[in-house]
Structures are given as structure tokens and as C-alpha cells.
Amino acid sequence: MEPDSVIEDKTIELMCSVPRSLWLGCANLVESMCALSCLQSMPSVRCLQISNGTSSVIVSRKRPSEGNYQKEKDLCIKYFDQWSESDQVEFVEHLISRMCHYQHGHINSYLKPMLQRDFITALPEQGLDHIAENILSYLDARSLCAAELVCKEWQRVISEGMLWKKLIERMVRTDPLWKGLSERRGWDQYLFKNRPTDGPPNSFYRSLYPKIIQDIETIESNWRCGRHNLQRIQCRSENSKGVYCLQYDDDKIISGLRDNSIKIWDKSSLECLKVLTGHTGSVLCLQYDERVIVTGSSDSTVRVWDVNTGEVLNTLIHHNEAVLHLRFSNGLMVTCSKDRSIAVWDMASATDITLRRVLVGHRAAVNVVDFDDKYIVSASGDRTIKVWSTSTCEFVRTLNGHKRGIACLQYRDRLVVSGSSDNTIRLWDIECGACLRVLEGHEELVRCIRFDNKRIVSGAYDGKIKVWDLQAALDPRAPASTLCLRTLVEHSGRVFRLQFDEFQIISSSHDDTILIWDFLNVPPSAQNETRSPSRTYTYISR
């Protein structure tokens, strides 16, 4: 590489051979060299000075007479218009390759705005408003806020397209928290209207969205901090105390009691609506849907009841000892018993239930079962979890790890969560049988457990309910000390069963009570409490 002094000498020599008017506009040596490079490669090109101090080099060819130029230009355009698009592109590429750097920059400045067209504004001009609305409807809330600030036309498309309403509707369709909140807060009445005139304007939904976000953040904070409104149903069994099982929906709570009865409660008033009798032993497990209630008892029978009338529709006599747990779904029912067996039933209707297969393999009472289309999962006092094929009822694998008998589990997708009399909770990958995490904190047998996408909630014989961070528990890097979010202590006896959703936990206990832990409707006074868990009591005795 030549030293700068040599380059400068050559440049000065070249500049001296060129009239001064050709390089006067070049403000420095580098620009001079660029201009002279153009001159050397294109002898017919002249470099002209730019005024106003921009120090830019303009290179242009010597223009022929005006008349010839216009004729030649028109002729060139005429031929250009007759060519195909590919030929036009090829011609322009050749043309650009013969130009200098300054000309390239000038063309780039001309093309840049043409390549940055505002298609959202252009589409409505072509009568394609619906396409512009559809494009913007995929934005999340933050992006939609930014889009409103682009220009008035974008704001108009968002407003007339009711895109804030559509965003809220999309969240309600895909997120159970949003769906439940829309029903409980009442703003579901403004959604999914067929005609835009049936509801409020876009501004209503624009202001509603941040209120929903604030509501959700408050609910999550209530879960983390243990703030809740507590309602208590005192069951007051006459013969013996204990609520062994329960299930609820928006309207009712159905519970199975140690006194052999099934009680149905109104969820709003907490009044006992109906008492079902027929079992001759404690009601240990139940499940219901929109048609039937199925119960299992220590009398070793399974009974099927009409959920509306309370009439007994069917009684299944198969197990030799207490029926400890059952699940049914999509025409299949699985029951398990103290007799160490699992029964798989085809459930065509409430009155047409036939035994398909008996699964044998556990060496102690089978305390709990769960299943989906792929696997049946069972847990036993023999310390093992066994996995069976749902379609063939064949044994698949055993999950080993608990040190004592297993009292409860839930299975969904690949995840199994189990609770044991060794006082621990274990998370398992059902496909490979690996134990993913051990949760410690309960002081006695873990009797009941449920999980969703965010949380695990467990109840134990120590009378405590613990809320765990599921996502953190699945992260091997998360410290054990961060996994338990909150411990709830209100029951005075063993916690037998619980169920929860995004807004509440409902639990039952040996203390003969059902507790409703409401994390949505927390009084403002409790919201301001930060040092300790807050609660408000509603006591119902029946």
C-alpha cells in the first residue's frame, strides 16, 4: 500500500491536469480523489461545484442539444414501456452499473420513499379497509397503542375496526383467566356481538383493557400474598365428622361426607339444596358432570345419581373393599379400591355401564387414579405409581421414588404430580418416568393435590394448604426456598380434598367444614395489607 504522501502527490498531479473549475467544489482530498476517479473512468463526465457548503460532488454527462435530448428521452421511454418487466429490470441494472457513486445516491434517495409505502393507509383508499383491519388485529396491546400514534388514518382504522374489542375477545377465547374474569365482572355482555351497533364504541374497549390488566395483576398479587375473602360452610354431620370429597362449578358445590350422605350446596347463598342418601358407608370420592353424579363409598359400591333430581340411576357392585377414588370422561370410567385393584368401565350411559378390564399389580390399596386418552395412572400405598395404556389396559411402567405410600396425584399432558405420606410432593415426566422435582414443606401426609398451568395447590393432614409455583418447580435452577408461594392455615383438622381455579380454592376437611378461599373479591382494606395474609370471614352453618 502506498504512503499517503505518494497518493497526495499523484492526486495533485492529476488535479493540475484538470481545469480548476472541475474540482473546486471538493472540500477535501478524499472527495477530490472520488471526483477524479470518476473523471478518469468516464472522460466525458464533468464535476460541478455544489453551493451552500454541502461539499458534495455532482457528476453529470454533457447534455446534447435540448431538442435531441427530448426526442431521445421520449424514444427511450417508448421502447422501455414496450418491454417485459424482466427486460425492464435488466436494462435498469445495466444503466445503474454505468453510473457513478453520486448518481447511485441520488437514485437511492428517489427510491427510498417509494419502497416505504404506508400500506395501512393505502388499503382503505382501494376499498380494502377489512384487510388493513385484519393486519392490525394481530397486534398485542403494546403494539396496538403504538399503532394508534402513527397517524390519524391508522387511528381511524383501529377505531372503526373495533380492534380493542377484538383483542379482548381473543384473550377471552384463549385464556381461562380472562374468560372467568369476563363472566364474574360482567363485561362479557359487551363481547361477541354480531353487529358493531349492538355494543359500545371502540373507546369503551380501549379504556376497559387497562382496567382488566389491573384486575389481573391484583388477583395475582392476592395469590402471592395470601389475601383472600374466606367463606365457611359448617356441615354439622349428625353421626360422624368429616367431608371427604367435593367438586364445584359456578352454581353449586357437591360434597361427600363421612356420615354416608352427599350434600349439594348453592354456591352463592351457601344453602344446602339437597341431601342424597343411599350409601351405607362413608362417601369417599365423587365426580359429576351436567347429567350424573358418580360416587364411591366405603360400602364398596359405586352409585350413579341424576344430578338434577338426585335419583339413584345405577349401582355397581364389583370391588371387595372400599372404593377410594374414581374418574370418568368420554364414555370411560376408572375406579380403584382398597382391594388393590383398578376397574376400567365402559360407560355408554348412566344405566349402561359394563366392566371392560381389571388391572392388577399394586401390592397395597390403590388410593387414586387419573387418566386421559393415552394413559391410566394409579398410585398406591405400596409407594409406587403405575402407568397403564388406556386403549389396551396393558401395563407400561412404574414410577418409583416416594419413601412411603402415595395418597393423591393428578395427571395432565406429560406431568404427574403426586403427594405421599412421606410428607413430600413429587413431579414426574410420565413418558420417561423421571422425577423432575421434590417439594418439601408439609409436616404430615399430603392428602390432596391439584395443579394448573401456574400453580400447584396441596392439602395435608397438618391442616395446611400450600400454594406452589409450578413453573419454578419445573425449572431445575430455581432454589427450593422460592417454590412455596403461600401457606394457608384455617382448617382445624386434616385437609381431605380441594379444588381450585384462577380465582378461588375450595377445600374440605375432617373438621366438618368446607372453606371457600376467594382471591378475587377481596375487600379494599385487605388489599392494603402487606405484612401478613388477610382474610374476611363469612360463616354459614347448616
From Swiss-Prot:
Residues 121-167 form the F-box domain. WD repeats lie at residues 238-275, 278-315, 318-355, 361-398, 401-440, 442-478, 490-527. One of its GO terms (cellular component) is cytoplasm. GO terms for biological process: negative regulation of non-canonical NF-kappaB signal transduction; positive regulation of circadian rhythm; positive regulation of DNA-templated transcription; positive regulation of proteolysis; proteasome-mediated ubiquitin-dependent protein catabolic process; protein dephosphorylation; protein destabilization; protein polyubiquitination. CDD domains: F-box_FBXW1B, WD40. It is found in: Cytoplasm; Nucleus. The keyword Repeat applies. SMART domains: Beta-TrCP_D, FBOX, WD40. Pathway: Protein modification; protein ubiquitination. This is F-box/WD repeat-containing protein 11.
